[in-house]
Structure formats: structure tokens, C-alpha cells
Amino acid sequence: MKVKCLLAVLLLSATATAFAQEAKYGIKSAILKKEAVTMGQKVQGVQYFDDYGRKEASELTMKVGGVANVEKHIRTIADGDKIISIDLDMKVANKATLPVKPVNYLNLTDEVRELHKIKEVGTEEILGRKCTKYTLEVVYGGQTTYSTVWIWKGIPLKNETSSNGMVIVTEQATEIQENAE
């Protein structure tokens, strides 16, 4: 059960950067290496995007199974308003409709700001890049999650998400390769 919950949280985290219909990033392409802690589990991730975020995929590697410490590998691919999640170890893929359209920070409208109660709360430097720091709320299925995100050119470089007073995800970019081919 814990593994399913962990995978669901990771999938939702991945979808926050996987909606690919409009340009959402201020650079053409990049490869971002990320480290996350989700419900106590360490996760290594790599995010790839091209065409200003219209094409996007990510890969996650995590250890699950308690004492067994089994390594799990997940790949997600954005496909319009759908996301394809591939368990590379089990050789199984699932396609799902995104539950909530992720926020496009390059094109924040008043409607989106109001819907998610988005507030700009300052700036901070991450990996030598000046990020705008935002707080927001996402309500899905009667559950509210609260996030603080650090955005550089539309790209989330850091994210802290909590629910019911507990931090459930912290994620931060550790390396950025801009204009990757």
C-alpha cells in the first residue's frame, strides 16, 4: 500500500511538469537532474524537455520495499492532456488523464492565480539562477495540498508540498543542462 501511495504522489509531482500543450518554459530545451524526498523515500529524477516544454518526459529512480531495498524505475511521458507512466521494471504502462492542469508560470492569468490562491512571496537563487518563489493551493478529490515552488523561466527548480500539516514532497534541481540536444 505504501508503494502505491508513494507512486501516486510521485506521479502527481511529475504531472506538475508534464502538461505539454502550450509553451511553458523560457528556454527551448533542458535536462534537469533532481533529488526528492517523498514520504521519507529518496527519489532521483531526471526531467527532459524540448520545444519550450511542449515535449516532456521524466525518469524516476527510487528504492522501495523496506529491508529488501528494491530499486524502482519509472518513466513518464506527456501526451497532451494525458500522461503515460511506464514501470520499467514490471514492463507495464498506464495512461491517465491529468487530474488538474499544472500551472503555467510563464502565462499566469488572474483566473489561475485566484483558483490556486497563488501568491508571489519573494525571490531566491537556486543553482545560480534567480527564482521567483510562489505559494499555492491545489484541491483535488476533496484534498487540499499546499506548495511552495521556486520558478526560473517557468521551470520549477524547487518544490515543497504538504497536506494535512505534513510535508509529503520536497524536490530540488541539482543540475541543469540548458539547450540540451
Q: Can you say where each PLM-predicted feature lies in the sequence?
A:
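N-terminal secretory signal peptides that target proteins for export/translocation
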Residues: 1-2
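Sec-dependent N-terminal signal peptides
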Residues: 5-14
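Sec/Tat signal peptide C-region and signal peptidase I cleavage site
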Residues: 15-20
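Extended soluble regions of mature proteins
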Residues: 22-181
